[in-house]
Structure formats: C-alpha cells, structure tokens
C-alpha cells in the first residue's frame, strides 16, 4: 500500500512538473517558443507563396537553416525560382561523378550576378608578382602539408556581403605568421584594411590585393586587432591608431606570376601564403573534393577572389592545394576547399604573396 501511495505521489509530481514545463513553453517570452513560432511563420509564408511541393518544403528548410527573411510574396517567389535553378545545377553536376561535389548553402537563393556583386572583388592587376622574390632551395618538400596541424592557422571568418576577401586573406597570412613567430594566436582587423588601405590601390568592399595590403601595413606602421577595430562589412572612415598597432610588417615576399613550384616551396617550408584566383559560377556551391574548372582564367586581370593557401596533398590521384576561404565555416569543407594543383588552376599562383612580421 505504501509503495502504491509513493507511486501515485510520484505520478502527481511528474504531471505537475510537466504541466509547469508546458505552461513555461507556452509563455510568449520563452525563446524556444519564439524560435518555433518563427520557423512556422516562415514556412507558412513560403508555402502560401509557392505551394506545397517537395521543392517548396526543401526551400522552406533552406530558408530557416540560413536565417533568410523575405519582404513579400513576390520576393519569396523570386528566391524560390533562383533556388530551384541552383538546385537543378547542383544535382546535374553531382550526377557527372567529377572530382568535386556541390551542395546547397547560404548562397543558393542568389543569382550569379548578385553573388558576384556582394562576395567578389573587382579584378586587380597584380603586377607586383611578375617578378617574384621568393628564393627556391634544394630542400626536399614533404608529400603533403597542412599548417592547421601546427596550430598557426586562425579560425575561418566570414566577409559577409562585402568584397573584402583580400583583407581576410591578408589577415589570415598575418595571423599565421604571428602565431609562428610568437607562439600565440591573434585575430587582426580586416576593417582597418577596408577603411584605411585605399592609397595602396585597394578599394575596400570593391576589392584589393594582399600584396598591396602588406605594403600598406609596412608603411603605415602596423595593423590593429579585430577587438580594437571590429569588422562591420561596410566601407567607413579610417580609425587607425598607431598606439594600438598589434603587428608590423617588415617586408612581403611575392611568388613569381604562375610559378606553382615557388608557391609549393613557400607553403611547404615557410608558412601559409595569400593567393587569389578567378571564381566562376558553380564554385560558390562547392561542397567537397578537388575543385577544377575549364572556364576560369589565370591572367592577372582574371582573378577576383583572394584566399589563403594553408597546405597541399593528393586526393584520388589528383594533386591539390588546401585553401582557407572567408565565406564562413558552414561553406565548403568547414570553410576550406581543395583546388587542383599543377595547372595554375584559375590563377591560384598568379597573385601569391606572404608577409614577414615583427
């Protein structure tokens, strides 16, 4: 009898706790309920605008995952159409069994022109690399290299809707050089470069080059930290303070235009190297494998995106560069991609350089 009473008391307590939890969930200020309500509202508005097809449900899940918000039914319909076209391209590509795969990501509701406008910089003539100053040696290079294993590669960042890739490539190289030299990590200011490096033929959110960013830092006297000069993703007035400079550039080293042997030597034996290449439609949907293209160019005026080469290797018999991007850790292979090596693919060795820090 006593056991029965205890069991009944336990059930009543559990029911009371469940009721209390239920009432707490239903409270309007409960953040979980707010998220669920927001998800249902977004899904409802999308399905109302484009119907209840399987593709529509896929689009609704995509919009929720990437925090999309659309102002009107017309905007939903437009984005759904773009998403559907990109999805068809992705599926068609993946059926071909090529060396890399594509997948849906946060850019899948953008047209190619929209993507280019907000994520890529204008083509820059990197004439400084026509005659490089990296010195080759007879040292034997390792078969593969990944500087992440040494702990000097900083976390992947996101440039947002600003063509400031060149600043992230630059800070990535500087952060690696700093960690290598001083044994500790640092996060440096991309925004300072966006706002302040214009006199060195850089154009803020409209593009620039790491080699020119290194020259700016060298002659300007230093670069501040991300904390001291935070990123906004917009062109702004220069707020540099020499008192808060965290790193100085003594010099920069350029890889001879197109010389992948020099680039491999530098990546193997020195540290990560800033590189640039031409992004063509399709690359934005990269999801894994070794990227290759027959439509991208490799001339100095072709390149439109700067990144950071952090290693190299071979996958499925195809040699590749291991490269850190600036489109967030959700893009590609945790923010990284592999690019075919040996053909100066898309100009990967056309505008390459690395800094020497103090």
From Swiss-Prot:
EC number: 4.1.2.-
PROSITE patterns, per the entry: PROKAR_LIPOPROTEIN, THIOL_PROTEASE_ASN, THIOL_PROTEASE_CYS, THIOL_PROTEASE_HIS
CDD domains: Peptidase_C1A (cd02248)
Propeptide feature ranges: 22-140
InterPro entries: Papain-like_cys_pep_sf, Pept_asp_AS, Pept_cys_AS, Pept_his_AS, Peptidase_C1A, Peptidase_C1A_C, Peptidase_C1A_papain-like, Prot_inhib_I29
Keyword Signal recorded: yes
SS bonds (residue pairs): 162-205, 196-238, 296-346
Glycosylation sites: 125, 254
Active site positions: 165, 305, 325
GO molecular function ontology, one term from the record: cysteine-type peptidase activity
SUPFAM superfamilies: Cysteine proteinases
Keyword entries, A-Z: Disulfide bond, Glycoprotein, Lyase, Signal
Pfam families, A to Z: Inhibitor_I29 (PF08246), Peptidase_C1 (PF00112)
Signal peptide: 1-21
Protein origin, superkingdom: Eukaryota
Catalysis: reaction(s): (E)-ferulate + H2O = vanillin + acetate; 4-O-beta-D-glucosyl-trans-ferulate + H2O = 4-O-beta-D-glucosyl-vanillin + acetate
Pathway field: Aromatic compound metabolism; phenylpropanoid biosynthesis
Gene Ontology biological process terms from the UniProt entry: phenylpropanoid biosynthetic process; proteolysis
SMART domains: Inhibitor_I29, Pept_C1
Protein task: Involved in the biosynthesis of vanillin and derivative natural products. Catalyzes the double carbon bond cleavage of ferulic acid to vanillin and of respective glucosides.
Family listed: Belongs to the peptidase C1 family.
Protein's name in the database: Vanillin synthase
Lineage: Eukaryota, Viridiplantae, Streptophyta, Embryophyta, Tracheophyta
